[in-house]
Amino acid sequence: MTTTIRHADFVDSIAGALQYISYYHPADYIAHLARAYELEKSAAARDAIAQILTNSKMCAEGRRPICQDTGIVNVFLKIGMDVRFEGFPAGVEDAVNDGVRKGYLDPDNPLRASIVADPHFERKNTKDNTPAVVQMTLVPGSTVDVIVAAKGGGSENKSKFTMMNPSDSLVDWVLKTVPTMGAGWCPPGILGIGIGGTAERAMLLAKQSLMEDIDMAELKARGPKDKTEALRIELCDKVNALGIGAQGLGGLTTVLDVKIAMAPTHAASKPVAMIPNCAATRHAHFVLDGSGPAYLEPPSPDLWPDVKWAPDYNKSKKVDLDRLTKEEVASWKPGDTLLLSGKMLTGRDAAHKRIQNMLAKGEKLPVDFTGRVIYYVGPVDPVRDEVVGPAGPTTSTRMDKFTEMMLAKTGLIAMIGKAERGPAAIEAIRRHRSAYLMGVGGAAYLVSKAIKQSRVVGFADLGMEAIYEFDVWDMPVTVAVDANGTSVHETGPAEWKAKIAGIPVAIA
């Protein structure tokens, strides 16, 4: 029997799914993250998980993005051979992009446009987050099975691939590789591992495995049924025993699950891919059967645990950014929690590159960074009465190569971002007696509530990568690298790896 899929239904389903996953976490992720929160013994990691859970519920209630990076769209289509497409002005992939465009430009909840059409030269933003990455397979049947995902750059950039010898140890490679990924992929999350096929097939297997439901708690409770499930448990436990923890701060839970997908391969080969999924974990599954657009049921409010993060005013230091001095910055200790109030500047990859070019030419910068703090962020556009949309930190290591320049030539005194800093940046921070502060990735809507005013002050043509001035009140951050160059992303995981090795713990 032939099924007719109409263009409008297809487009509306893609757009609706992208809106849905921008503000609703999958139920399985929340259940496993809540369990990790209950088990966590590290105060810093527990606080980070509390922020993620609180942010998640806020986003569900406010229908605003979980993360400011609303991702590059991945769509997996299994198209029944008895399906007929009606009213499609172009191909199926073009229809996917029509849906992406509609979903990302929704005036009630505009999503951040992050896609640049020319990846090597001009890197100009397409303004509507198209094109998507589309995988299509023809299968028997009369329906279209659809998986829609939106993958953030922080986790996608940590993807790994290796071509192993057949006798090489997969477990050893994973345990050696995960620490090199840092915390820019926003753990706690999921690892997807693809084994076999060819290089590109292994990468696709890893990505597809991340679309499966998280079931590690159930798997451990009932025990493995086969070698693959036993390997998943082994990898999950051993990765968590590394002590990396939530946001890389050190703790019991780094991964909530490990997924494995395999395909036949050449006798001389063992291609292995590993792709992490972050704390946003955006994906949805639906089937089009010709009856109309897909409907995705909103999750029950009862899904979320009774976790309501709020600043700890007894343990946190209040900082006035408008009166901040280098001496005060140098007094901060690793792990200190700060509540920032006052004016800060923003800037990320494109802004730093342009600043570098302007300084090289002796040109005047659009803003004075002297005595200022910079926040690595590309916010979502505001709606209704918002000052700014979700505005969580981006991965800071991408700005490492600019750190010496910014501290030495602009008068900048501190930086805010996500995850760890590399050796060169840490040395620059130590040399200039500066500091690096971190916010929690995956808590973008929560963070945005601390921003009371926002205006573009430079490089407006860069869109979300423009330089903004934010006026904030009690914005929560942690001292991640102090003026002596001590990094909590080094000390925290080392401490918790040792603790886990010496104490019996239940790994989430």
Task: Label every model-predicted segment.
Residues 337, 343-347:
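Short, charged beta-turn/beta-strand-edge "cap" motif at the junction between a beta-strand
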Residues 327-330, 367:
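Residue "hotspots" at secondary-structure boundaries inside conserved domains
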Residues 191-198, 341-342, 417, 440-441:
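Glycine-rich beta-strand-to-loop/alpha-helix junction loops that act as flexible
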Residues 250-258, 265-266, 279, 449-508:
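C-terminal binding/interaction regions
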Residues 329-332, 338:
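Short, well-ordered loop/turn sites that connect or cap secondary structure elements
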Residues 314-324:
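Short, structured beta-strand/loop micro-motifs enriched in basic residues and often containing a Trp
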